């Protein structure tokens, strides 16, 4: 299997005045093409911090994060942003959709950040993927006009519209009731498999984690036996 993402000896320390807090200690992780991995841990275990480092949203205190053979933490923010937009999709517990934009406009936005994609092309690709998540009748609706499950479907469509090689998902169903959570994760899994995109998700839900190919337990910033 080819590695999409590789992290080695990741440490993260936050300094607040004279107080230093080590959140992550000596973590290694490899994500292979098409793989589905769940990172499980309680609140405060460092899951979201790790996801931010792997996605180039922050840099480790020490250690290396490689994405498609390129060292993220040697890049400036503009370069990391370009790598994120090219290779990664993000899904969060709270959808982070822009309230003033329609579903189509929200989903098209990552494509419009690419100079080679026209507005018309971006819109059509957004419509196509919204159709694939069952929202063909909600294209012109704004987030406030959608249900919680529908908003998360829009977020999934936005994450996948650029055809990323890896999706990073932070509690992707954590804000939904059981039935909606099952439906949304089933949809995400189906699209991830169809598009041959790798998925790395953090969750506190072991039932959800059981659906992944691999489960990793993060406790107090260290890997432990799952």
From Swiss-Prot:
Keywords: ATP-binding, Cell inner membrane, Cell membrane, Membrane, Nucleotide-binding, Translocase, Transport. InterPro entries: AAA+_ATPase, ABC_transporter-like_ATP-bd, ABC_transporter-like_CS, ABC_transpr_LolD-like, LolD_lipo_ATP-bd, MacB-like_ATP-bd, P-loop_NTPase. It comes from the Bacteria. Pfam families: ABC_tran (PF00005). Its main location: membrane. GO terms for molecular function: ATP binding; ATP hydrolysis activity; transmembrane transporter activity. ATP binds at residues 41-48. Its EC number is 7.6.2.-. Residues 5-226 form the ABC transporter domain. The complex is composed of two ATP-binding proteins (LolD) and two transmembrane proteins (LolC and LolE). Part of the ABC transporter complex LolCDE involved in the translocation of mature outer membrane-directed lipoproteins, from the inner membrane to the periplasmic chaperone, LolA. Responsible for the formation of the LolA-lipoprotein complex in an ATP-dependent manner. Belongs to the ABC transporter superfamily. Lipoprotein translocase (TC 3.A.1.125) family. NCBIfam families: LolD_lipo_ex (TIGR02211). This is Lipoprotein-releasing system ATP-binding protein LolD. It comes from Psychrobacter arcticus (strain DSM 17307 / VKM B-2377 / 273-4). The lineage of its organism: Bacteria, Pseudomonadati, Pseudomonadota, Gammaproteobacteria, Moraxellales.
